[in-house]
From Swiss-Prot:
Known partners and oligomeric status: Component of the ISW2 complex.
Domain Helicase C-terminal intervals: 457-608
Region: Disordered, residue numbers: 85-130, 1010-1056
Taxonomic source organism: Candida albicans (strain SC5314 / ATCC MYA-2876) (Yeast)
Protein name: ISWI chromatin-remodeling complex ATPase ISW2
Job of this protein: Catalytic component of the ISW2 complex, which acts in remodeling the chromatin by catalyzing an ATP-dependent alteration in the structure of nucleosomal DNA. The ISW2 complex is involved in coordinating transcriptional repression and in inheritance of telomeric silencing. ISW2 is required for chlamydospore formation, distinctive morphological feature of the fungal pathogen C.albicans that can be induced to form in oxygen-limited environments and has been reported in clinical specimens.
Gene Ontology biological-process annotations: cellular response to copper ion; cellular response to pheromone; chlamydospore formation; filamentous growth; negative regulation of antisense RNA transcription; negative regulation of transcription by RNA polymerase II; positive regulation of filamentous growth of a population of unicellular organisms in response to biotic stimulus; positive regulation of transcription by RNA polymerase II
Length: 1056
């Protein structure tokens, strides 16, 4: 039976089971024994689920029968289902034989229908319009379809994966479905929604917006706060929906597994793709009638990870991963011809789609949001500068054995990954290496641009986009790249915002709001790919630049979706920077390969946080490293292009199309074989694996056979492991004696911001030398360069040879004297006084907090850092201001602090001037006079509104947090503006800009006309976006400045 529901009534107002006592509700919410005992009572749900799946496809019977063969009770249940369906099967046969029903058959069918016509399980709900219980708006057509799909899952007792592309409203569809259970099925909980920590508040606000009657509890906070929530709200059943994070699940598992959850909803469900992870195991322990996974990226790169998700949803169906893998293994077909391979491949894909269809809903924006134009993706291929080529060559030569594939089994992959990381840094900017940037003194000028190929192209592109009126998002994996881009923005005078992994939640929101403001002057938004890839809406930008590519291509797709989502009015253009004839070309190729695999397994599949092995084997890594290395060694000069930016983009579009065509032609077998079988030693059409070592690709570049190179390692553990290794010179059998190895002293990476005392540095150096003496460490000449000629070129301070240098260093070890007890005590004391536990991030956060709150606001600075006590902050601050000149590049840190201090001083001055003016008046709202600039005769705000704004600023103070929100609340509650639509409709940002304009007028009035000229002479602009701006106003949805709003619009406003 099918019923069509429009859900136009909501008479219950969220109060169900009015006759249910608190104790009865508590009993309904909590398990009597445990999850295993409760599942034994869910036979009816399981029967309905299996009956539905067996009716869909014979493919499900394969998995169900496997579980039945291992469980007698399960097997009995399947037989019962088969016996119930036997009558239907006979009816089908009767239809096929084209004979009439007998009276007995018809009576039996009618009887069965009558018995179940009022049965809730036989009724199907179909929403035809947005349900009335959704407040503050309506669902779109495709969202209603999604809601109906979720309802059908519930009615068939199935769990599922809502996998719509990001930006299509998965959160709203989920809330609508839980609303359906509450208002239509009268099931008001308990529900649990497990989400990333960063989206906790967003989920709470979405529930409050769309279904305000739902009692939502958020479980977070410290141990005491959580204990209070669990005791007072959860155990007493005073909630409908519990929202919590993955971390809280791990910490409060014992409390949360006591509940009889109606639904477990997991947002960003890729977190449970590994069935052996702690999080996945714990959630599987929870009892629930149904589960819903929400992800923009449902399918991982191998079928086993897909099975992990399906096993979580339906463990009684998908219980054997080996059989799942075997069912779709289509690689063992070497003896078949191409036609047969293609036929089998098509069959495997078809079966997989058939298997997935009941559990998976996937829509993309291009299909459901016709107004959203498709994004245009272009790979921009860029050469390297002379400096980049030099550094790239150095990195390859540093570990040429690994580059040529001569690596051990244990440390081999780690070595290769380290080389890959270093080469990718070089492709981004050589200044990412310490010592590469010219200085001191360190300057911010053109060398930031011309020493990196990517920066040269970026500089050209940004000038073009600025002229066209576009706004730009720039993503990079590396926060230090953002540091360089920040300096660049400052140098080019581009207004920008920034978010990385260290940005606090409050600062993220502030930066996003500032960038998305209607008349924002921010041109660029700098983001790290992972930190800025989720939970952010930046549709005010239409250009996305991926400065480098993430290993996981889905992270890049998430980044693009920050701008390409519903609400975007322009066509989004995505530009991915790729360094030509270098490792980045191979990284991009692997990403395209991964995405093609997704596309073949599930139509337009997306995933996040993929960890499959594509491109991560040793051979793959060697192939990446070797790609383009020959050209680097043969050419000492860079390959930078001086072409026009349009020509560069045109060439990039052509190469992008070639790359896409290359992978679009590959089938499932091709892509999987390419993944596992493609040799990393295939280069330039030749296979070098069949040749001897001397003919290998790497050994053609340089000839290391002339000398034995010492392996360079930066791992302290590996270093001492090699040093302490016993020489195998005795061949006869001897009784092994235990070797007591001396304990290595702790090694400190001394950094300038840690303020190590000179005496402490000396003691630590002596301690290391004494240890080397104890273990009889010997330097070799290879520790001081590859050759005397090269060594002297690199170190032109003296003319000593490598051997002379070695002798001096060895002499230090030989003459080393162990520290005395008194010196050890001194060392420990100086270590306590130093700040060796302060990382570079701690230092950067300290600079930011000092600039924001002030030099002596130790308590606020400590709170901002989060991991330091107030006393330690005070001690560090005093040390910093006494010794800041010891820090390399201290000028930029001081300028950052001083710039914010000037802004704060300006606000204090404005506060004083405003107070002086207002406090001299008996009735400020009536008597306050404002001297407007001469060109402000057509202002939109009335004098009454301006006076009220200034009065509120004086009342709260300019330094008050959320000042403009509080003034907005004052306006809405004031009787003065009860019918003033204009002022009531202003946003807090617009109110803030108007206040900045008024304070500027007050300052000019109180300090005289020469004040502006003095400030201008000092290099301070009155129109700086940092210190105030002229307020643009909005009438009828159009933006205007006060000078260009015509009289007719002003009259309209006054009439309103």
């Amino acid at each position: 039976m099918t019923t069509t529901s429009t859900t136009t009534t909501n008479t219950t107002n969220g109060q169900f089971c009015s006759d249910e006592s608190l104790e009865e509700r508590r009993k309904r919410f909590l398990l009597e024994v445990d999850a295993k005992h409760e599942r034994a009572h869910d036979k009816d749900d399981a029967t309905k689920r299996f009956q539905y799946l067996l009716g869909l496809s014979a493919l499900f019977r394969k998995f169900i029968n496997l579980n039945a063969s291992k469980d007698p009770a399960f097997k009995k249940r399947i037989r019962e289902i088969d016996s119930k369906t036997s009558f239907k099967e006979s009816s089908k046969k009767a239809k096929n034989s084209r004979r009439r029903k007998t009276e007995k058959e018809e009576d039996a069918e009618l009887l069965q229908d009558e018995e179940h016509q009022d049965d809730e399980d036989h009724q199907h709900t179909v929403m035809t319009e947005s349900p009335s219980y959704i407040k503050e708006g309506k669902l779109r057509e495709y969202q209603i379809q999604g809601l109906n799909w979720l309802i059908s899952l519930y009615e068939n007792r199935l769990s599922g994966i809502l996998a719509d592309e990001m930006g299509l409203g998965k959160t709203l569809q989920t809330i609508s479905f839980l609303g359906y259970l509450r208002y239509i099925k009268h099931i008001d909980g308990p529900f649990i929604v497990i989400v990333p920590k960063s989206t906790l508040d967003n989920w709470r606000r979405e529930f409050a917006k769309w279904t305000p009657d739902v009692n939502v509890v958020v479980l977070q906070g410290d141990k005491e706060q959580r204990a209070s929530i669990i005791k007072d709200q959860l155990y007493t059943a005073k909630f409908d929906v519990l929202i919590t994070s993955f971390e809280m699940i791990l910490r409060e598992k014992s409390a949360l597994q006591k509940f009889r959850w109606e639904y477990i909803v997991v947002d960003e469900a890729h977190r449970i793709k590994n069935e052996d992870s702690s999080l996945s195991k714990i959630i599987r322990l929870f009892y629930s009638r149904n589960r819903l996974l929400i992800t923009g990226t449902p399918l991982q790169n191998n079928l086993h990870e897909l099975w992990a998700l399906l096993n979580f949803l339906l463990p009684d169906v998908f219980g054997d991963s080996d059989q799942f893998d075997e069912a779709f293994d289509n690689q063992n077909s070497e003896e078949l011809d191409e036609e047969e391979k293609q036929r089998r491949q098509d069959k495997a894909v078809s079966e997989l789609h058939q298997l997935l269809s009941p559990f998976l809903l996937r829509r993309v924006k291009a299909d459901v949001e016709k107004s959203l134009l498709p994004k245009i993706e272009t790979n921009v291929y860029i050469g390297m500068t002379d400096m980049q080529v030099e550094w790239y060559k150095r990195l390859l030569e540093k570990d040429i054995d690994a580059v040529n594939g001569v690596v051990g089994k244990r440390e081999g992959k780690t070595r290769l990954l380290n080389i890959v990381m270093q080469l990718r840094k070089c492709c981004n900017h050589p200044y990412l290496f310490d010592g590469a940037e010219p200085g001191p003194p360190y300057t911010t000028d053109e060398h930031l641009v011309y020493n990196s190929g990517k920066m040269i192209i970026l500089d050209k592109m940004l000038k073009k986009f600025k002229a066209e009126g576009s706004r730009v998002l720039i993503f990079s994996q590396m926060s230090r790249v953002l540091d360089i881009l920040e300096d660049y923005c400052y140098f080019r005078d581009y207004e920008y915002c920034r978010i990385d992994g260290s940005t606090s939640h409050e600062d993220r929101i502030e930066a996003i709001d500032e960038y998305n403001a209607p008349d924002s002057e921010k041109f660029i938004f700098l983001l790290t790919t992972r930190a800025g890839g989720l939970g952010i809406n930046l549709t005010s930008a239409d250009i996305v630049i991926l400065y480098d590519s993430d290993w996981n291509p889905q992270a890049d797709l998430q980044a693009m979706d920050r701008a390409h989502r519903i609400g975007q009015k322009k066509q989004v253009k995505v530009f991915r920077f790729v360094t030509e004839k270098a490792i980045e070309e191979k990284v991009l190729e692997r990403a395209a390969q991964k995405l093609r695999l997704d596309q073949l397994v599930i139509q337009q599949g997306r995933q996040m946080n993929s960890n499959n092995n594509v491109g991560n084997s040793k051979d793959d890594l060697i192939g990446m490293i070797q790609h383009g290395a020959k050209e680097v060694f043969e050419n000492s000069k860079g390959t930078m292009l001086d072409d026009d930016v349009e020509e560069i983009l045109k060439r990039g579009a052509e190469k992008t199309a070639e790359l896409n065509n290359k992978f679009n032609k590959l089938g499932l077998d091709d892509i999987q074989n390419f993944t596992s079988d493609a040799s990393a030693y295939e280069w330039n059409g030749q296979d070098f694996t069949k040749k001897g070592n001397n003919a290998s690709l790497g050994l053609n570049w340089i000839n290391p056979s002339k000398r034995v190179r010492k392996e360079l390692t930066y791992s302290v553990d590996n270093y001492y492991k090699d040093v302490l290794k016993q020489p195998a010179v005795v061949k006869e059998k001897v009784v092994k004696q235990p070797v007591v190895k001396p304990k290595a002293p702790k090694s400190y990476n001394v950094q300038d911001h840690q303020f190590f005392a000179d005496e402490l540095v000396t003691l630590l150096e002596r301690e290391q030398l004494a240890f080397k003496k104890e273990i009889s460490y010997q330097y070799s000449v290879d520790d001081f360069g590859d050759s005397d000629e090269e060594f002297l070129e690199q170190d032109d301070e003296d003319d000593m040879t490598r051997d002379e240098k070695r002798k001096i260093a060895q002499e230090k070890i030989n003459n080393a004297v162990a520290l005395t007890e008194e010196e050890i005590a001194t060392r420990d004391r100086l270590l306590e006084e130093s700040f060796h536990n302060w990382s570079r991030r701690d230092f950067t956060n300290f600079i930011h907090a000092t600039a924001k709150y002030g030099r002596n606001e130790y308590k606020k600075i400590a709170k901002a850092l989060g991991n330091k006590k107030r006393s330690e902050i005070e001690r560090y601050s005093k040390m910093f201001w006494q010794n800041y000149q010891k820090i390399e590049g201290y000028e930029k840190y001081l300028s950052q602090i001083e710039a914010v201090e000037k802004k704060r001083e300006k606000l204090i001055n404005q506060q004083k001037l405003l107070a002086k003016k207002i406090e001299s008046l008996q009735d400020p709202l009536e008597d306050l006079k404002i001297q407007y600039p001469p060109n402000n005769s057509k202002r939109v705000y009335s004098k009454t509104e301006d006076k009220f704004l200034l009065y509120c600023v004086h009342k709260y103070g300019l330094s008050t947090e959320n000042l403009y929100d509080k003034i907005k609340d004052e306006i809405l509650t004031s009787d003065i503006f009860k019918f003033d639509w204009y002022i009531r409709s202003r946003t807090p940002q617009e109110i803030g800009r108007r206040i900045s304009t008024l304070l500027l007028a007050i300052t000019r009035e109180m300090e005289g006309p020469l004040h502006g000229k003095k400030r201008k002479a000092m290099g301070e602009s009155n129109n700086s976006s940092r210190f105030g701006s002229v307020e643009p106003s909005s009438i009828n949805g159009e933006k205007h400045s006060p000078e260009v709003i015509d009289n007719e619009q002003t009259v309209k406003k006054l009439k309103l």
